[in-house]
Amino acid sequence: MAPANDAFVAEAAGEVVGSYFLHANQLGGGSHVANCGYVTAQQATGRGIARAMCRHSIDHARARGFRAMQYNIVVSTNERAIRLWQAMGFAIVGRLPGAFAHPALGDVDAFVMYQTL
C-alpha cells in the first residue's frame, strides 16, 4: 500500500462544516491500519457531520485497502465523541493517563480506539 495522506472537507449549503485526514497509522508493519483526525465546526455540532465523516472515512479506508482503523488520542472528557465512535464500531483498547492537556480541566486521560475493517 503506497503511503498517502488524504484530506476531505464536509460542506453544507456551501459552507465548510468539517474536515478530516486519513493516512496510515504507521509505516512498515503497521501500515495496514488507518488513522484519522476529524474537526467539526462548532456551529455544525449535533447535525450528523462527524457521523457522516466517520462513515466516509471508513468506506475510504476500506477502498484504500486498510484492514483496520485506529484513533490514537480520544480525549476521555469528550463523551459525545466517544459515544459516536463506539456507535460506529470502535472499541476503547487502551487508556493513556494524563495524555491530554485540557485547557480548562488540566491533564486528562485519553483513549486509543480501534476497529477492524
Go through the PLM ranges and name each one.
Residues 1-43, 54-55, 116-117:
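Acetyl-CoA-dependent GNAT
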Residues 38-40, 46-63, 79-87:
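Conserved acetyl-CoA-binding loop-helix of GNAT-fold acetyltransferases
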Residues 61-74:
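Conserved GNAT acetyl-CoA-binding A-motif
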Residues 71-81, 99-103:
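Conserved beta-strand-loop-alpha-helix junction that forms the acyl-donor binding cleft
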Residues 86-96:
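Conserved acetyl-CoA-binding loop of GNAT-fold acetyltransferases
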Residues 96, 102-117:
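Terminal substrate-recognition subdomain of acyl/acetyltransferases
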